[in-house]
C-alpha cells in the first residue's frame, strides 16, 4: 500500500498518468518535443510489471502535474477553449486499455515482450534513448497496434513523419495504457468520468499538486 496517498488519491493519480501521457504525446506531435523528466517517469512505469500500487509504478508523482491539470479541466463544467486533442487521446487510451484487458493472448504477448526488454535495459543509458523508444514503440505496434481501434494523431506533418518522434508518441501511448491498467486495478472505471465528476474533482482538490515530489 502507498503511505503517501489514500486509495482514492492513488486511483486519481493513476488516471492523471493516462492524461499526462496523452498531453506529452500531443506535445511531441505538435512541437516535436516534450518534458523529458515526465517522459522518463512514464516509460519507467511501463517497465514496472508487477507493482500493485501507485508508488510502485510512479515514484515521482510531481512529474504528473500536467496530467492532473488536464484531468481537472476535463472534469470541469467550463472547458471552453481547452485543447481537446490530449483529452481525446486520454479517453482513447482508456478505451484501448479496455480492449486489451479483454484479450488475454495479447496481454500475455505484451508482458513477455516487456519482460524480455527489461532484461536488456542495461544496454540503454536512459528510457528516453531513441533506441529504447523504438523498442517500446515496436512492442506497441505488435500488440495494441493490431487492434481495429486506432488512435488518430493530429500534429505537424514533419514531426509525425519523423521516425524517432513517431516512436516517442507510440511509447507514450503504451505508457498511457499501462497507467490505465493501474487505474482499473485500483478500482477506476470509465463510467466514473460521467457519473462521479464531483467526487473526482474533490479528490483532485485534496491533493497538494504543487507539493508533489
Swiss-Prot record:
The keyword Magnesium does not apply. It is found in: Cytoplasm; Cell inner membrane. It is a peripheral membrane protein. GO terms for cellular component: cytoplasm; plasma membrane. It comes from the Bacteria. Signal peptide: none annotated. Keywords: Cell inner membrane, Cell membrane, Cytoplasm, Membrane. Belongs to the HflD family. This is High frequency lysogenization protein HflD homolog. It comes from Alcanivorax borkumensis (strain ATCC 700651 / DSM 11573 / NCIMB 13689 / SK2).
